[in-house]
Regions:
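Domain-level signal for soluble alpha/beta catalytic cores
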Residues: 1-199
Length: 199
């Protein structure tokens, strides 16, 4: 705050669901400790930890926090869904648990603080690790998650069409129509048309 003054700055942190996905779902060697034999207890503790983190950022002067989350991009990918299913995971059930966990984390969010979510399919050296439209997670995430807005990757056909946006409630949506993966600029008129299409 002493540096930013009255300028609204955005801080980004991994979403609670990323913590769980990386440690407990992707990691095939994960074995729950005794306290977390019931996964609901772990979801709860992660959410409470995030409540404290959100408050700490607020007390430090942060009024705009973004949750970075690539787990939802994975949940859109048909091949990844198949792989997780073969390992015994029900991704729809996990997705509902993630939304509940995020909503619990946001329960103590002060009114004058904005929390948004950024969803993408990865971007490391202009490559990605998942593909697929938002339809598999749209109703669960867009229809029930209490963030103030979504930043959604829509820079290629890998992201599907705009129909999943029908589940958006009162949140703001930022469409990621400009790619960082290639040096060529998009045509301005094409970008305008895509925005109109999304409306």
């Amino acid at each position: 705050k002493s540096v930013a003054g009255d300028t609204l700055c955005k801080m980004t942190i991994p979403s609670p669901s990323m913590l769980h996905l990386i440690c407990c779902v992707r990691a095939e060697e994960y074995i729950p400790i005794e306290r977390y034999q019931d996964m609901k207890d772990l979801y709860y503790d992660i959410a409470i930890a995030y409540q404290k983190v959100i408050r700490a950022f607020y007390d430090a002067g942060c009024r705009y926090l973004q949750l970075d989350d690539t787990s939802w991009g994975e949940f859109c990918d048909a091949e990844k869904r198949k792989t997780y299913k073969e390992r015994g995971f029900d991704l729809d059930e996990i997705a509902r648990s993630y939304v509940d966990m995020i909503n619990l984390a946001l329960e103590a969010k002060p009114e004058d603080m904005t929390v948004t979510m950024h969803i993408c399919r990865g971007n490391f050296r202009s490559t990605w690790f998942s593909s697929g439209g938002y339809e598999p997670i749209a109703e669960i995430l867009f229809g029930h998650c209490n963030v103030d807005g979504f930043f959604l990757e829509y820079d290629s056909e890998r992201s599907g069409d705009f129909s999943p946006l029908r589940y958006i409630k009162d949140q703001k949506v930022v469409l990621g129509l400009i790619t960082s993966k290639f040096p060529e600029l998009e045509d301005k008129e094409d970008v305008k048309k895509r925005i109109e299409e999304a409306e």
